[in-house]
Amino acid sequence: MDFTYPEVGATRDRDSMPGDAHVVGQRRALGGPEVFDPAVEFVLGFGMQRGAGFDVSASTALAEEGTELVMRARFGPVRVVAPARVVYVIAEADRCGFAYGTLPGHPESGEELFLVERVGEETWVEIRAFSRPGRWFTRLGGPVVRLLQARATVAYLDAASLAADGG
């Protein structure tokens, strides 16, 4: 299956994300350098998605390029099924994470990066994403869909913070 958007890999660089898409970028401090390795394991194991309330089925236990995943969630009476594939993995000494891109059937069309970064004596988590409506109902639901996306982003960050605190 092909990705549902042409800018595959664009989340690698903030400046190369498409200007005509809804763009999200949020960072949060998790703690000192001691939480870096556990945070990386949590993120690569799809912990942010699970911690935000998504049921995640993935073809590998940890994110690697080509991993296929399906996320499922309920938002009130609405059930969402969101297939995606890992586009790339970052595995550097002080930066680790992955980005996934949407596949046919996903309500949105775009890419999302989940990154853990050690900066001096602090560990940070960052989410960087761009998206456009991918289905008729996300086009129709415009502002509500953006609100749900914003809530999901905060829930991802909350899940990472809770995990870093030992929860």
Residue ranges and their predicted role:
Residues 1-76:
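Hydrophobic ligand-binding cavity/cleft-lining segments
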Residues 28-30, 71-73, 88, 118, ...:
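Hydrophobic side chains in beta-strands
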Residues 31-34, 38, 144, 148, ...:
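Short amphipathic alpha-helical segments
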Residues 40-48, 105, 121, 158, ...:
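Short, intrinsically disordered, mixed-charge
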Residues 70, 97-99, 124-126:
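General beta-strand recognition
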Residues 75-120:
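Hydrophobic-ligand binding "helix-grip"
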Residues 102-147:
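Beta-strand/loop substructures that line and gate deep hydrophobic ligand-binding cavities in soluble
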Residues 148-167:
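Long, compositionally biased interface segments
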